[in-house]
Amino acid sequence: MAHRLLVNVIFTGASVFGRAFTEAYRQAAKASAAGAAGRPAKASSAGGIPVEEAMKILDLEKSELSLDKVEEKYEYLFNVNSKEQGNSFYLQSKVYYAMDTLKKELEYLEKLQNEKGAASN
């Protein structure tokens, strides 16, 4: 009787684990395919940060997002947070990565706009 119960528990656990594994694999494959469809993957490696966070760091609104504004805010915040002013390298790196992320986003948006313009001609 105990053997039958133990075997039943093992088979039930294995089937639950198998279903969870296949569902996780399906979700990962779907996310991978969506990421490869053109939009750059979320910037999460090598210091990259999400666009929304980068805009908060540089205190920018979506409506005022331009390369000039990004560089202006970057210069100001980078200099204010310099080690010579008694501030931290950590804050400077956050400001730098925010600027880098927004520059990449602006390049991507410009590329999309150019492709749409070329497609409509």
Swiss-Prot record:
Residues 53-107 are annotated as: J-like. One of its GO terms (cellular component) is TIM23 mitochondrial import inner membrane translocase complex. GO terms for molecular function: protein domain specific binding. It is found in: Mitochondrion inner membrane. GO terms for biological process: protein import into mitochondrial matrix. Its main location: mitochondrion. Coiled coil: none annotated. Keywords: Membrane, Mitochondrion, Mitochondrion inner membrane, Protein transport, Translocation, Transport. Disulfide bonds: none annotated. The keyword Protein transport applies. InterPro entries: J_dom_sf, Tim16. Heterodimer with PAM18. Component of the PAM complex, at least composed of mtHsp70, MGE1, TIM44, PAM16, PAM17 and PAM18. Belongs to the TIM16/PAM16 family. Essential component of the PAM complex, a complex required for the translocation of transit peptide-containing proteins from the inner membrane into the mitochondrial matrix in an ATP-dependent manner. In the complex, it is required to regulate activity of mtHSP70 (SSC1) via its interaction with PAM18/TIM14. May act by positioning PAM18/TIM14 in juxtaposition to mtHSP70 at the translocon to maximize ATPase stimulation. The J-like region, although related to the J domain does not stimulate ATPase activity of mtHSP70. It nevertheless mediates the heterodimerization with the J domain of PAM18 and is therefore essential for PAM complex function. This is Mitochondrial import inner membrane translocase subunit TIM16. The gene is PAM16.
